Amino acid sequence: MPAETRTMPGRISRERNGDPIASGWCLIVYETAVRHEPLDEWRGEMACADPDARQAIAAAEGTTLYLHLDPYGGEFEPWHGPVTAKLISPDLDPYGRRIALTSAGPLIRFRQGVEEKTPAGA
């Protein structure tokens, strides 16, 4: 399947709807999927030069965090889902601005998540 990319402003928190520990522009790569369906497999990067945010990401490495992407550039609904994040090595990121993002669960591409939907007839 062909890959698609989206660039959107985003933030990472320790839990869903939590206070952000890092924020910046995110590049998300995923295989073409049905619009508005959750993305099970995706990866990306965040640009973040804030030293405190980078320290928080380093301290949380190996744990599941939460990514929230704001609507931008033709996407009219926020995207959100669990993520693991780690700083990219200084050999590949000499300016210390890149954070690698890896799926830790589906990335929901609409305002109401799958887990929040009310069953039919309820």
Model region roles, listed by residue range:
Residues 1-4, 51-61:
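Short linear motifs in intrinsically disordered
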Residues 2-4, 114, 118-122:
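Surface-exposed beta-loop interaction hotspot
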Residues 2-43:
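Solvent-exposed edge beta-strands and adjacent loop segments
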Residues 8-12, 24-26, 42-46, 63-65, ...:
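One face of beta-strands
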Residues 37-56:
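Charged, amphipathic alpha-helical segments
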